[in-house]
Amino acid sequence: MLKHIKFIDNHGSFCVNRPENTSYLYFPLASEAGLKSSVTPVLGGDSKIDQDTFLLEPVSSENLHNNRSSRNFWIVKEGHIPYSVTGSSAQQEANRFTDRQEDSELTAGFMWQTLKRTSRELGFISTVTSFIPKSDNVEIMYVTVENQTDTVQKFTAYGAIPVYGRSADNIRDHRNVTSMLHRIETTEHGINVCPTMSFDERGHQPNHKIYYVNGCSGKGENPISYYPTVEDFIGEGGTYTHPRTVYEGYKGVPAHSLAAGKEAMGAFCFSSFTLAPGEKTDFILLSGIADSKEEIENIFEKYNTSDKVKNALEETRIYWKKQVNVDFHTQDPDFDSYMKWISFQPFLRRLFGCSFLPHHDYGRGGRGWRDLWQDCLSLLILDPKEVRSMILNSFAGVRFDGTNATI
């Protein structure tokens, strides 16, 4: 795998050409507040806080190439078929491994990634930057579109993120029944989903979590039309990679509409726009989990312009760089950069544990004493201030006879 990676700085940042051609590739994103995500080169993966609180449908490694359910952003150029800036359309997938496959590049660092795609056929370049601010439970997609032709082009844009909104247990246990608990509303900024109850092995519990997808232009302009359920968005006979709504231009519902009892969709349409030669525009998608509508509104106000998002991205990059404060200097610069990621692993272990990445899908989020002790050993070098409390808190949970020490 390393032969495909080109390291681009001294902090482990790298780029990969046509990353969608690499199987089982995904990237971790997380905050210190609890939100944990995995994101693939075509923006598959999932997002969650814990076993019982999944924003996006839970995935394991085999789901990475099986699932169509993924984060997406569609651009429709006037007079042409729709285009996915994530590469997740039926047409773009069919073009893969042929001379019609478009150029793409993934650039990534600690807790952020940027996907760049070039459509020669449609004459524009798009980028999607994904990250989670260190202190908030919101995943941010920052999308840019730049006209590369010599003529003015007209476009329409759609944000589209399926909202799972419940426990991982419900993937096969009461999947249909729990969708009937969904209470969905459209707001000025997007879609909120608040199931009436959680329904898992703990029993029937009243639910207060709100799963949401908000969107705006880089200038803070709201969507104009909304698609709050999967059926609304994909249409009769449609799929996530070939949604009838986008292909046939169906109009959605207005803000302040209600839906219930169906699989939820965080999808909306923006006002059409034109780009002069060389002109660029941008959009922001915010997806997350909150305890109140006020919290969602505060998050939106915090990240509703391109400048705010760029500042948050820079803060996120600086924060995680500072955490990995060990440098390596050998005769092989690539090895030195690779070792930065080895040093970053204990932080990922602390945040994700054994249960919340596609190849680490065992258990329900718990970590045994052996795991915690191994993490503490490496953190003694990287973050010694926190290790004493981690050891004391971990020992406090071990039974006197040691019978739960590795559970």
In which residue ranges do the predicted regions lie?
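Anionic coordination/interaction segments
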Residues: 1-373, 381-400, 405
